[in-house]
Amino acid sequence: MATQRKSKSKYVPALGFDWLTPFYDAVVGITLRERTFKEALIRQAHLEPLQRVLDLASGTGTLAIWIKQGEPAAVVTGVDGDPVVISIAKDKASAANALVQFDCAMSDALPYPAAHFDRVVSSLFFHHLSWHSKVRTADELFRILKPGAELHVADWGLATNLVMRGLFFFIQLLDGFENTQDNVSGKLITLFEQAGFADVSQRQTFHTVFGTMSLYCGRKPG
Protein backbone atom coordinates (compact mmCIF):
# COMPACT_ATOMS: atom_id res chain seq x y z
CA MET A 1 0.00 0.00 0.00
CA ALA A 2 1.19 3.52 -0.77
CA THR A 3 0.30 7.16 -1.20
CA GLN A 4 -2.57 8.39 -3.36
CA ARG A 5 -0.68 11.35 -4.74
CA LYS A 6 -3.34 13.22 -6.70
CA SER A 7 -6.44 12.68 -4.63
CA LYS A 8 -8.43 14.93 -2.38
CA SER A 9 -8.08 12.00 0.00
CA LYS A 10 -5.08 12.65 2.17
CA TYR A 11 -3.08 9.86 3.74
CA VAL A 12 0.40 8.70 4.55
CA PRO A 13 2.95 6.78 2.41
CA ALA A 14 3.68 3.14 3.19
CA LEU A 15 6.46 3.82 5.74
CA GLY A 16 5.56 7.43 6.44
CA PHE A 17 7.95 8.93 3.86
CA ASP A 18 8.38 8.35 0.12
CA TRP A 19 12.14 7.84 0.46
CA LEU A 20 11.51 4.77 2.64
CA THR A 21 9.45 2.99 -0.02
CA PRO A 22 12.40 0.93 -1.40
CA PHE A 23 12.81 -0.59 2.08
CA TYR A 24 9.14 -1.51 2.48
CA ASP A 25 9.39 -5.21 1.59
CA ALA A 26 12.29 -5.81 3.95
CA VAL A 27 10.72 -3.95 6.88
CA VAL A 28 7.31 -5.64 6.55
CA GLY A 29 8.86 -9.05 6.03
CA ILE A 30 11.01 -8.80 9.15
CA THR A 31 8.68 -7.05 11.60
CA LEU A 32 5.10 -7.99 10.74
CA ARG A 33 5.04 -11.75 10.10
CA GLU A 34 4.11 -10.86 6.52
CA ARG A 35 4.02 -14.36 5.06
CA THR A 36 1.98 -15.67 7.99
CA PHE A 37 -0.81 -13.11 7.89
CA LYS A 38 -0.93 -12.71 4.10
CA GLU A 39 -1.13 -16.45 3.53
CA ALA A 40 -3.91 -16.57 6.14
CA LEU A 41 -5.71 -13.79 4.26
CA ILE A 42 -5.41 -15.72 0.99
CA ARG A 43 -6.78 -18.89 2.61
CA GLN A 44 -9.62 -16.90 4.12
CA ALA A 45 -10.63 -15.61 0.67
CA HIS A 46 -11.21 -19.17 -0.68
CA LEU A 47 -10.14 -18.25 -4.20
CA GLU A 48 -11.33 -20.31 -7.16
CA PRO A 49 -10.26 -20.61 -10.82
CA LEU A 50 -11.39 -17.81 -13.14
CA GLN A 51 -12.42 -15.52 -10.31
CA ARG A 52 -11.57 -11.85 -10.74
CA VAL A 53 -9.51 -10.73 -7.77
CA LEU A 54 -8.48 -7.16 -6.94
CA ASP A 55 -5.65 -6.39 -4.54
CA LEU A 56 -6.50 -2.89 -3.32
CA ALA A 57 -3.46 -0.74 -2.55
CA SER A 58 -1.23 -3.51 -3.86
CA GLY A 59 2.01 -1.68 -3.09
CA THR A 60 5.04 -3.60 -4.31
CA GLY A 61 2.85 -6.48 -5.45
CA THR A 62 3.68 -9.21 -2.94
CA LEU A 63 0.11 -10.20 -2.09
CA ALA A 64 -1.13 -10.08 -5.69
CA ILE A 65 1.79 -12.23 -6.85
CA TRP A 66 1.21 -14.80 -4.11
CA ILE A 67 -2.48 -14.95 -5.04
CA LYS A 68 -1.63 -15.62 -8.68
CA GLN A 69 0.93 -18.25 -7.75
CA GLY A 70 -1.55 -19.98 -5.46
CA GLU A 71 -4.45 -19.88 -7.93
CA PRO A 72 -2.95 -19.54 -11.44
CA ALA A 73 -6.36 -19.58 -13.14
CA ALA A 74 -7.59 -16.54 -11.21
CA VAL A 75 -7.58 -13.17 -12.98
CA VAL A 76 -5.58 -10.98 -10.61
CA THR A 77 -5.35 -7.18 -10.67
CA GLY A 78 -3.43 -4.91 -8.33
CA VAL A 79 -4.20 -1.21 -7.95
CA ASP A 80 -2.25 1.48 -6.12
CA GLY A 81 -2.10 5.25 -6.13
CA ASP A 82 1.70 5.45 -6.31
CA PRO A 83 3.31 5.01 -9.75
CA VAL A 84 6.67 4.26 -8.10
CA VAL A 85 5.42 1.14 -6.32
CA ILE A 86 3.40 0.12 -9.38
CA SER A 87 6.67 0.02 -11.33
CA ILE A 88 8.30 -2.07 -8.59
CA ALA A 89 5.32 -4.44 -8.56
CA LYS A 90 5.43 -4.95 -12.32
CA ASP A 91 9.12 -5.83 -12.16
CA LYS A 92 8.52 -8.28 -9.30
CA ALA A 93 5.64 -9.97 -11.13
CA SER A 94 7.72 -10.30 -14.28
CA ALA A 95 10.60 -11.83 -12.32
CA ALA A 96 8.19 -14.28 -10.69
CA ASN A 97 6.52 -15.16 -14.02
CA ALA A 98 3.20 -14.14 -12.48
CA LEU A 99 0.65 -12.64 -14.87
CA VAL A 100 -0.82 -9.82 -12.79
CA GLN A 101 -2.22 -6.55 -14.11
CA PHE A 102 -1.19 -3.49 -12.10
CA ASP A 103 -3.12 -0.23 -12.43
CA CYS A 104 -2.43 3.20 -10.97
CA ALA A 105 -5.58 4.71 -9.45
CA MET A 106 -7.05 6.11 -6.25
CA SER A 107 -8.97 3.90 -3.86
CA ASP A 108 -11.99 6.19 -3.80
CA ALA A 109 -12.22 6.45 -7.62
CA LEU A 110 -11.42 3.01 -9.01
CA PRO A 111 -11.37 2.59 -12.82
CA TYR A 112 -13.51 -0.55 -12.87
CA PRO A 113 -17.16 -1.16 -13.75
CA ALA A 114 -19.78 -1.99 -11.17
CA ALA A 115 -20.19 -5.63 -10.13
CA HIS A 116 -16.88 -6.62 -11.74
CA PHE A 117 -14.85 -8.52 -9.11
CA ASP A 118 -15.46 -11.76 -7.20
CA ARG A 119 -13.00 -10.87 -4.44
CA VAL A 120 -11.29 -7.75 -3.16
CA VAL A 121 -8.35 -8.21 -0.82
CA SER A 122 -6.36 -5.50 0.91
CA SER A 123 -3.41 -5.50 3.26
CA LEU A 124 -2.20 -2.75 5.59
CA PHE A 125 -4.00 0.04 3.80
CA PHE A 126 -7.06 1.36 5.61
CA HIS A 127 -5.08 2.69 8.57
CA HIS A 128 -3.49 5.23 6.22
CA LEU A 129 -6.85 6.84 5.43
CA SER A 130 -8.89 9.47 7.23
CA TRP A 131 -12.37 8.31 8.24
CA HIS A 132 -13.91 10.21 5.33
CA SER A 133 -11.56 8.50 2.88
CA LYS A 134 -12.19 5.13 4.52
CA VAL A 135 -15.92 5.62 3.91
CA ARG A 136 -15.46 6.62 0.28
CA THR A 137 -13.14 3.67 -0.31
CA ALA A 138 -15.49 1.15 1.30
CA ASP A 139 -18.32 2.48 -0.87
CA GLU A 140 -16.17 2.00 -3.98
CA LEU A 141 -15.36 -1.57 -3.03
CA PHE A 142 -19.03 -2.32 -2.55
CA ARG A 143 -19.72 -0.89 -6.01
CA ILE A 144 -17.13 -2.94 -7.90
CA LEU A 145 -17.90 -6.27 -6.22
CA LYS A 146 -20.46 -8.62 -7.72
CA PRO A 147 -23.53 -9.54 -5.66
CA GLY A 148 -22.45 -12.37 -3.38
CA ALA A 149 -18.77 -11.45 -3.74
CA GLU A 150 -16.47 -10.93 -0.77
CA LEU A 151 -14.11 -8.40 0.77
CA HIS A 152 -11.09 -9.62 2.78
CA VAL A 153 -8.89 -7.15 4.66
CA ALA A 154 -5.76 -7.46 6.79
CA ASP A 155 -5.00 -4.38 8.87
CA TRP A 156 -4.34 -3.12 12.36
CA GLY A 157 -7.24 -3.76 14.70
CA LEU A 158 -8.42 -3.48 18.27
CA ALA A 159 -5.50 -4.38 20.51
CA THR A 160 -5.86 -7.77 22.17
CA ASN A 161 -3.99 -6.66 25.30
CA LEU A 162 -2.16 -3.69 26.82
CA VAL A 163 1.19 -4.78 25.42
CA MET A 164 -0.19 -4.82 21.87
CA ARG A 165 -1.78 -1.41 22.44
CA GLY A 166 1.52 0.00 23.65
CA LEU A 167 3.43 -1.40 20.68
CA PHE A 168 0.91 0.16 18.28
CA PHE A 169 1.95 3.60 19.52
CA PHE A 170 4.99 3.39 17.20
CA ILE A 171 2.72 2.83 14.18
CA GLN A 172 0.68 5.85 15.21
CA LEU A 173 3.82 7.97 15.43
CA LEU A 174 4.81 6.85 11.93
CA ASP A 175 1.45 6.87 10.14
CA GLY A 176 -0.52 9.47 12.10
CA PHE A 177 -2.79 9.30 15.13
CA GLU A 178 -5.95 10.48 13.38
CA ASN A 179 -5.72 7.93 10.56
CA THR A 180 -4.87 4.98 12.79
CA GLN A 181 -7.25 5.63 15.67
CA ASP A 182 -10.22 4.17 13.78
CA ASN A 183 -8.36 0.87 13.49
CA VAL A 184 -7.21 0.56 17.08
CA SER A 185 -10.70 1.57 18.23
CA GLY A 186 -12.17 -1.38 16.34
CA LYS A 187 -14.20 0.69 13.86
CA LEU A 188 -13.43 -1.21 10.63
CA ILE A 189 -16.34 -3.59 11.17
CA THR A 190 -18.69 -0.60 11.48
CA LEU A 191 -17.10 0.93 8.38
CA PHE A 192 -17.81 -2.10 6.20
CA GLU A 193 -21.32 -2.56 7.58
CA GLN A 194 -22.18 1.06 6.83
CA ALA A 195 -21.02 0.53 3.23
CA GLY A 196 -23.61 -2.24 2.88
CA PHE A 197 -21.58 -5.39 3.49
CA ALA A 198 -23.24 -8.30 5.28
CA ASP A 199 -21.78 -10.90 7.63
CA VAL A 200 -18.89 -8.58 8.52
CA SER A 201 -16.58 -10.08 11.10
CA GLN A 202 -13.05 -10.21 12.43
CA ARG A 203 -11.83 -13.71 11.64
CA GLN A 204 -8.29 -13.89 13.04
CA THR A 205 -5.74 -11.84 14.93
CA PHE A 206 -1.95 -11.98 14.95
CA HIS A 207 0.50 -10.51 17.44
CA THR A 208 3.32 -8.53 15.82
CA VAL A 209 6.09 -6.33 17.13
CA PHE A 210 3.92 -3.29 16.31
CA GLY A 211 0.55 -4.45 17.61
CA THR A 212 -2.46 -6.58 16.74
CA MET A 213 -3.01 -7.48 13.09
CA SER A 214 -6.63 -8.40 12.32
CA LEU A 215 -8.23 -10.19 9.38
CA TYR A 216 -11.71 -9.01 8.41
CA CYS A 217 -14.26 -10.24 5.93
CA GLY A 218 -17.59 -9.12 4.54
CA ARG A 219 -19.98 -10.13 1.76
CA LYS A 220 -21.95 -8.03 -0.72
CA PRO A 221 -25.55 -9.22 -0.45
CA GLY A 222 -27.09 -10.90 -3.46
Region locations from a protein language model:
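Class I SAM-dependent methyltransferase SAM/SAH-binding core
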Residues: 54-56, 60-109
